[in-house]
Amino acid sequence: MRNKMIYFNFHLFVIIFANLQIFQVQAANIFCYYDTQRITDVNAAINYLEPALQFCNFLIYGYAGIDGETYQVKSLDYGLNYDIYQAITSLKLKHNRLKVLLSIGGDRDQTEDLAEDNKYLKLLENLSSRNAFINSIQSVIRTYGFDGLDMAWQFPKNPPKHEHSGFRKYLDKLMNLFRRSPVIDENSAFHKEQFVSLLTELRQSLNPMGAIMTMTVLPHVSAELFLDVKPIVNHVDFIILATFDYLTPYRDPTIAHYTAPIYAVSEHDPSHNINYDVQYWLNHTTATSKLVLGVPAYGRSWTMIKKSGITGHPPITAGGPGRAGHRTLTAGLLSWPEICVKIHQNKELEGDAARFRKVSDPTKRFGTYAYRSVDENNEYGIWVSYEEPKTAANKAEYAHARNLSGVALFDLSMDDVTGECGDGTYSILKSIHNAFKKFK
């Protein structure tokens, strides 16, 4: 009996110590998101991914979705099936301190069917749907060896607020006094309550497995409407704030501005900045040790037109999303290497090949942007607000100063995977890692 008790106590100590190692409270955790929506070759993806993992504490694989009929987890990696799940979790054999989580939603589980898009709310509404989801989560974690899951739940978005300056800004404020606020979700109070129920039930099911659960707060999701902060904090291990894309060319195609400033910018919505979001969660009694700051590895671009002027100083009038890059293939979105190559382009080149002019922020408050004014034919103008290694390091320093748990990079596929920018591979990720190293 005495030997059994000694064994039990030792076993319990090992479990507790292991968990302390995982959740060490310091601003040094790096969460690396990996979005595979453009991946077609599993082996190539793994080869490109592996060098980044020495800098990551957590790898968050995205994204899985939800079947709108069964409410079970489904793969969104069309053509890859579930093979890549096993390949991703097998990376832990080389990186034994790495924890690999499966992210659900992340604004990737989208269709043109409105009923299908509402499935994230419908799932919350009854116990049987929630149980189907939870059982499928348990099965996926056990089958493929994930260490847990990330809940990047797809709640309805706040409607865009168009940015204006000068007299138009004050006119808009006056008009807003007489406008009715749009109804985002008539049952938001019920969904808020049931989301807590889902997290409670998930936590109970994951605890015996020793699984981790994080929550990603996606851009433009109202925490006031959908997230009951205090009970949520009790059920998740980390809360990851996607503190970027405050303004995008799809939410407002007519005005280009900073998309992920640390602090409030003049002529900008005062809530559209990192410090505002962090303070909101802290004001609602969230422990700093649970908060993680999201940093993008890309830029958002707008088309400059003749009315945009030639200075590039934001806010500027724009003509819609900028041209798609050769990697992202998405209008209004450029990866870090697509931007850095244009900044260092030969100045003699013209047209779409012409270089971007970079404008840094010496205050470290708002971020960096680059632009190319229209040519004599009013063509090829572009303006992009983006993240680079220096600004990412600034945000890591901010996270440390606020005593947050760490930084999450969105995402590895947008970083300099092949070293095109001249600073080696994964230069944004390494800048975050090096910023934290200074404080050890």
From Swiss-Prot:
Lineage top rank: taxon: Eukaryota
Family matches, as InterPro entries: Chitinase_II/V-like_cat (IPR011583), Chitinase_insertion_sf (IPR029070), Glyco_hydro18_cat (IPR001223), Glycoside_hydrolase_SF (IPR017853), Glycosyl_Hydrlase_18 (IPR050314), IDGF (IPR015520)
SMART domains in alphabetical order: Glyco_18
One GO location term (cellular component): extracellular region
Residues annotated as signal peptide: 1-27
Residues with glycosylation annotation: 126, 283, 403
PANTHER family from the UniProt entry: CHITINASE, CHITINASE-LIKE PROTEIN IDGF1-RELATED
Family membership noted in the UniProt record: Belongs to the glycosyl hydrolase 18 family. IDGF subfamily.
Record-annotated GH18 domain positions: 28-439
Record's keyword terms, sorted: Developmental protein, Disulfide bond, Glycoprotein, Secreted, Signal
Lineage, uppermost ranks: Eukaryota, Metazoa, Ecdysozoa, Arthropoda, Hexapoda
Originating species: Glossina morsitans morsitans (Savannah tsetse fly)
Alphabetical list of Pfam families matching this protein: Glyco_hydro_18 (PF00704)
Name used for this protein in its record: Chitinase-like protein Idgf5
Miscellaneous notes: Lacks the typical Glu active site in position 154 that is replaced by a Gln residue, preventing the hydrolase activity. Its precise function remains unclear.
Protein task: Cooperates with insulin-like peptides to stimulate the proliferation, polarization and motility of imaginal disk cells. May act by stabilizing the binding of insulin-like peptides to its receptor through a simultaneous interaction with both molecules to form a multiprotein signaling complex.
